[in-house]
Swiss-Prot record:
<keyword id="KW-0004">4Fe-4S</keyword>
<protein>
    <recommendedName>
        <fullName>Photosystem I iron-sulfur center</fullName>
        <ecNumber>1.97.1.12</ecNumber>
    </recommendedName>
</protein>
<dbReference type="InterPro" id="IPR050157">
    <property type="entry name" value="PSI_iron-sulfur_center"/>
</dbReference>
<keyword id="KW-0603">Photosystem I</keyword>
<comment type="function">
    <text>Apoprotein for the two 4Fe-4S centers FA and FB of photosystem I (PSI); essential for photochemical activity. FB is the terminal electron acceptor of PSI, donating electrons to ferredoxin. The C-terminus interacts with PsaA/B/D and helps assemble the protein into the PSI complex. Required for binding of PsaD and PsaE to PSI. PSI is a plastocyanin-ferredoxin oxidoreductase, converting photonic excitation into a charge separation, which transfers an electron from the donor P700 chlorophyll pair to the spectroscopically characterized acceptors A0, A1, FX, FA and FB in turn.</text>
</comment>
<feature type="binding site">
    <location>
        <position position="58"/>
    </location>
    <ligand>
        <name>[4Fe-4S] cluster 1</name>
    </ligand>
</feature>
<feature type="domain" description="4Fe-4S ferredoxin-type 2">
    <location>
        <begin position="39"/>
        <end position="68"/>
    </location>
</feature>
<keyword id="KW-0472">Membrane</keyword>
<feature type="binding site">
    <location>
        <position position="14"/>
    </location>
    <ligand>
        <name>[4Fe-4S] cluster 1</name>
    </ligand>
</feature>
<dbReference type="GO" id="GO:0009055">
    <property type="term" value="F:electron transfer activity"/>
</dbReference>
<dbReference type="GO" id="GO:0009535">
    <property type="term" value="C:chloroplast thylakoid membrane"/>
</dbReference>
<feature type="binding site">
    <location>
        <position position="11"/>
    </location>
    <ligand>
        <name>[4Fe-4S] cluster 1</name>
    </ligand>
</feature>
<dbReference type="Pfam" id="PF14697">
    <property type="entry name" value="Fer4_21"/>
</dbReference>
<dbReference type="GO" id="GO:0046872">
    <property type="term" value="F:metal ion binding"/>
</dbReference>
<dbReference type="InterPro" id="IPR017900">
    <property type="entry name" value="4Fe4S_Fe_S_CS"/>
</dbReference>
<dbReference type="GO" id="GO:0009522">
    <property type="term" value="C:photosystem I"/>
</dbReference>
<keyword id="KW-0934">Plastid</keyword>
């Protein structure tokens, strides 16, 4: 099952989510929109196991990284039974 990983622009570039991910789904990429000049990116969402460790590691008040499990994604799209 494929999960959706969304990175929000509230990312502060701390790398905590990248280090917490056991399957290397996340990586940091250059971005001038925050103090750290980098932001998390999720180029390998097909490897996401849905553990949400990245969410737990995020230090921002509004989670900058969110994992939507496949059943949550289909429900929000009106595709679940």
């Amino acid at each position: 099952m494929s999960h959706s990983v969304k990175i929000y622009d509230t990312c502060i570039g701390c790398t905590q989510c990248v280090r917490a991910c056991p399957t290397d789904v996340l990586e940091m990429i250059p971005w001038g929109g925050c103090k750290a000049k980098q932001i998390a990116s999720a180029p390998r969402t097909e490897d996401c196991v849905g553990c949400k460790r990245c969410e737990s590691a995020c230090p921002t008040d509004f989670l900058s990284v969110r994992v939507y499990l496949w059943h949550e994604t289909t429900r929000s799209m009106g595709l679940a039974y």
